[in-house]
């Protein structure tokens, strides 16, 4: 989990929607599997990989270094776009960044099937 801050409270929904368009793509079938979610817990906000969410639910999951790199890369990109700020001190634990995921533009969203790998609240 990467602790973040939002520029404005209403940015929560922007980040949540943007994350639905970031993940692993099957270009042939036009399916995108969402990698990360935004989590609010006790007044704090986090970018969380779906496997971390499953682990918090008590499920046995193996989170790979590739999963961590993807989560970190997504958080950095959201920060570059001005949607979030990564809390100071979090960067020291972040992995080397790579572009190992796909971002579907808002305009292309209707052309793709967007599939969350975790549903918050279920």
From Swiss-Prot:
Pfam families noted in UniProt: Translat_reg
One example of a Gene Ontology biological process annotation: regulation of translation
Keyword Repressor in record: yes
Annotated InterPro entries: Transl_repress_RegA (IPR002702), Transl_repress_RegA_sf (IPR036516)
Keywords: Repressor, RNA-binding, Translation regulation
SUPFAM superfamilies: Translational regulator protein regA (SSF55064)
GO MF: RNA binding
Segments of the chain annotated as binding DNA: 15-37
Biological function: Controls the translation of a number of proteins (such as regA itself, rIIB and at least 35 others) by binding to their mRNA.
Annotated protein name in UniProt: Translation repressor protein
Organism: Enterobacteria phage T4 (Bacteriophage T4)
């Amino acid at each position: 989990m990467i602790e973040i801050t939002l520029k404005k409270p209403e940015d929560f929904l922007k980040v949540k929607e943007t994350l639905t368009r970031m993940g692993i793509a099957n270009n042939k079938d036009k399916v995108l599997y969402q990698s990360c979610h935004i989590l609010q817990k006790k007044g704090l906000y986090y970018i969380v990989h779906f496997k971390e969410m499953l682990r918090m639910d008590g499920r046995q999951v193996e989170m790979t270094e590739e999963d961590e790199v993807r989560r970190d890369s997504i958080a950095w990109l959201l920060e570059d776009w001005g949607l979030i700020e990564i809390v100071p001190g979090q960067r020291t634990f972040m992995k080397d960044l790579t572009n190992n995921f796909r971002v579907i533009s808002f305009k292309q969203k209707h052309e793709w099937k967007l599939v969350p790998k975790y549903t918050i609240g279920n």
